[in-house]
């Protein structure tokens, strides 16, 4: 619930508020939708989280997204190979911000989503 989330004070360097909380709901809803649409038996954590973070950042207002991206150290990954389970486990905020920045730079985003769901990318 929101009251528990609010105890964190900040997330992605942004003060906790209801708008930020609603993007967390988008993140979790994406997990549920993706789970029904993966075409492989065991998608990787990086595949699941990449999609969820892209949806979360996409659900943010432009102003909130800019604040969250500024509050997170990123390099601007150009390769999906950089999205590893270790990055997610040790720095999930960075993983999420990098995922959104990467996805935003992809010309055919629909094809990328299909490739993730098919296990063609972000796999073991």
Regions from the language model: what does each represent?
Residues 1-4, 20, 52, 87, ...:
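Intrinsically disordered, low-complexity N-terminal regions enriched in serine/proline/glycine
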Residues 23-36:
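Active-site recognition of the HExxH zinc-binding catalytic motif
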Residues 5, 49, 113-116:
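Extended hydrophobic/Leu-rich segments
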Residues 44-76:
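Post-HExxH zinc-binding segment in Zn-dependent metallohydrolases
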Residues 63-124:
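Long, well-structured alpha-helical subdomains associated
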Residues 1-18, 32:
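Active-site scaffold of zinc-dependent metalloenzymes
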Residues 15-24, 42-47:
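Soluble non-cytosolic domains of exported or imported proteins
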């Amino acid at each position: 619930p929101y009251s528990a989330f609010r105890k964190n004070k900040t997330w992605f360097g942004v003060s906790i508020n209801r708008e930020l909380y609603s993007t967390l709901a988008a993140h979790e809803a994406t997990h549920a939708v993706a789970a029904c649409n993966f075409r492989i038996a065991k998608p990787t954590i990086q595949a699941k989280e990449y999609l969820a973070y892209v949806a979360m950042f996409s659900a943010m207002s432009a102003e909130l997204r800019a604040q969250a991206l500024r509050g997170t150290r990123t390099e601007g990954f150009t390769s999906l190979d950089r999205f590893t389970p270790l990055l997610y486990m040790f720095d999930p905020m960075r993983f999420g911000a990098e995922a959104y920045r990467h996805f935003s730079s992809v010309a055919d985003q629909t094809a990328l989503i299909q490739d993730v769901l098919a296990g063609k990318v972000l796999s073991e």
